[in-house]
């Protein structure tokens, strides 16, 4: 397990994201933006009880640390039994230190894959993820960097190939989100962060990975329900997620002649650091309450979808799919 600090200044990226966050918070202090309404009890469909709203008031500094969340996200999927679906494979996961990326890393390891995770700055979260991967009997590589930097992406891929002998699965999962009540509120800096991370980052990492991917390899992109239905306060973010869905389908058509499948998972609300680092303290208490399940998903409820799409034994004829995991037909 190693931490590789690259020349690109990730500290600057984090401070830029926090500046955008502070601007939003200041606007809402003056406008008095209210919180959402409550919910009834959630239906039970999971093998174990899952947390329901309301959750405690909380707000995280970007990019958000999983260790600070209350309740802690569930990512270990103890009811999931591995069966060597990814045995002998190497996977690279962006945004792999926490949230969905962490849960995917754990299940990939349980299925026999070695895992490299790329993350921005949360070293403690990344170490915990790697420790969980290693407990599954797999190897884990930690790589610090900003996916907006194409040189970082090339380096991350090369480090993965050097460490594990190849690259079989790429999961583009890193993202940036900051809400705005109108398009006029979105500054150039805000827009650059969103487009740079959510579109350029996906293209940068995929472009770097492709020369190392052979027939049978798989690329999985993290989309969003906002890319399917839009969101009134996530204008730029929704646009990037729609673009990711289109990129997924286009790459699937482009790469099938090389035997490389490309699919996406489109999650609904998921309890990760991502949203508490965006929403206000009061608003987050009811996060996920308006979904059909009346609660947010836990990361461990998303990760099996990524295993399914990555595994040739499960999804060899699935290509260009946008798999919605919404808790209902419209989230």
Residue ranges and their predicted role:
Residues 224:
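Residue(s) in the substrate-gating loop at a strand-loop-helix junction
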Residues 211, 253-257:
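Alpha-helical segment proximal to the catalytic Tyr-Lys
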Residues 212, 260, 298-325, 330:
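C-terminal substrate-recognition "lid" of short-chain dehydrogenase/reductases
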Residues 206, 240, 248:
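Active-site helix of classical SDR
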């Amino acid at each position: 397990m190693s931490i590789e600090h690259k020349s690109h200044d990730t500290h600057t990226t984090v401070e830029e994201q926090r500046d955008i966050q502070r601007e939003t918070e200041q606007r809402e202090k003056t406008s008095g933006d209210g919180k959402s309404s409550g919910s009834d009890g959630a239906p039970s469909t999971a093998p174990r009880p899952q947390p329901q709203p309301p959750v405690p008031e909380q707000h995280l500094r970007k990019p958000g640390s999983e260790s600070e969340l209350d309740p802690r996200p569930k990512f270990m999927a103890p009811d999931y039994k591995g069966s060597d679906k990814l045995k002998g494979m190497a996977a690279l996961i962006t945004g792999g230190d926490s949230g969905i990326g962490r849960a995917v890393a754990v299940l990939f390891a349980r299925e026999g894959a070695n895992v490299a995770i790329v993350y921005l700055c949360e070293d403690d979260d990344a170490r915990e993820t790697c420790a969980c991967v290693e407990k599954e009997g797999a190897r884990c590589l930690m790589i610090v960097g900003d996916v907006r930097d194409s040189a970082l992406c090339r380096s991350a891929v090369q480090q993965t190939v050097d460490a594990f002998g190849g690259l079989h699965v790429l999961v583009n999962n890193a993202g940036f989100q900051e809400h705005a009540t109108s398009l006029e509120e979105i500054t150039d800096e805000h827009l650059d962060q969103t487009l740079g991370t959510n579109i350029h980052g996906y293209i940068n990492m995929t472009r770097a990975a492709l020369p190392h991917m052979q027939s049978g390899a798989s690329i999985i992109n993290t989309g969003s329900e906002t890319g399917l239905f839009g969101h009134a306060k996530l204008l730029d973010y929704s646009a990037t997620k729609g673009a990711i869905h289109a990129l997924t389908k286009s790459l699937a058509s482009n790469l099938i002649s090389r035997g490389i499948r490309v699919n996406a998972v489109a999650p609904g609300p998921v309890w990760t650091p991502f949203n508490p680092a965006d929403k206000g303290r009061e608003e987050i208490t009811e996060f996920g309450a308006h979904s059909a399940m009346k609660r947010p998903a836990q990361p461990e409820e998303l990760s099996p979808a990524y295993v399914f799409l990555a595994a040739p034994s499960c999804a060899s004829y699935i290509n260009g799919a946008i798999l919605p995991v919404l808790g209902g037909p419209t989230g």
